[in-house]
Curated annotation (Swiss-Prot):
Belongs to the endoribonuclease YbeY family. The keyword Cytoplasm applies. Residues 156-183 are annotated as: Disordered. It comes from Saccharopolyspora erythraea (strain ATCC 11635 / DSM 40517 / JCM 4748 / NBRC 13426 / NCIMB 8594 / NRRL 2338). The keyword NAD does not apply. This is Endoribonuclease YbeY. It is found in: Cytoplasm. One of its GO terms (biological process) is rRNA processing. The lineage of its organism: Bacteria, Bacillati, Actinomycetota, Actinomycetes, Pseudonocardiales. Keywords: Cytoplasm, Endonuclease, Hydrolase, Metal-binding, Nuclease, Ribosome biogenesis, rRNA processing, Zinc. One of its GO terms (cellular component) is cytoplasm. SUPFAM superfamilies: Metalloproteases ('zincins'), catalytic domain. Binds 1 zinc ion.
Length: 183
């Protein structure tokens, strides 16, 4: 799965983490490994221009999704047997998201994760214009984020345990040495 990211926002963000949550969401939605996605982080004025041009709404917003193809609702890219797909672009505005994160009481990175998953779901054909659509999309978004956080925490615990085990083994001279004959 190819995920390109470009930070043109002037705000320093951990780009690999944004790519990671996008990949996790696409995997959870069973999107083909041949799919391609682009994520662009932009400044407030750029987002304002995009928001007005494409949504006819004034001012900036947090996330916009631009699908490359119109998908038949019965043939979304997350449906079984879907082949390669150029999903489209997700545009994030970290400066706008920073204020939302503060109001929500969480970090900018948590907000960018949420917005990335939100954008992925829009590219896959989900929407929240109607109450039932909103329940489905936001429920799925929250589940993907909870699963992502749980998987990340489990990986961090496993890495910490490996480091602790290595330190103990090294202290007693039993740690494996890299070199010929070792794995």
């Amino acid at each position: 799965m190819s995920i390109e990211i470009a930070n043109e926002s002037g705000v320093e963000v951990p780009e690999p983490s944004i790519v990671s949550v996008a990949r996790f969401a696409l995997d959870k939605m069973s999107v083909s490994q041949l799919a391609e996605l682009s994520i662009v982080l932009v400044e407030l004025d750029v987002m304002s221009d995009l928001h007005e041009r494409w949504m006819d709404l004034p001012g900036p917003t947090d996330v916009m999704a631009f699908p490359m193809d119109e998908y038949d609702s019965s043939r979304r890219p997350d449906s079984a047997g879907a082949g390669p797909a150029l999903l489209g672009d997700i545009v994030l505005c970290p400066a706008f998201a920073k204020d939302q994160a503060r109001k929500a009481g969480h970090s900018l990175l948590d907000e960018l994760h949420l917005l990335t998953v939100h954008g992925v779901l829009h590219l896959l054909g989900y929407d929240h214009a109607e109450p039932e659509e909103e329940r489905e999309m936001f429920g799925l978004q929250n589940q993907i984020l909870a699963d992502f956080r749980a998987a990340k925490a489990a990986a961090e615990r496993e890495q910490a345990q490996r480091s602790a085990d290595s330190a103990v083994l090294g202290a007693v001279g039993l740690e494996e040495q890299d070199g010929p004959g070792t794995h």
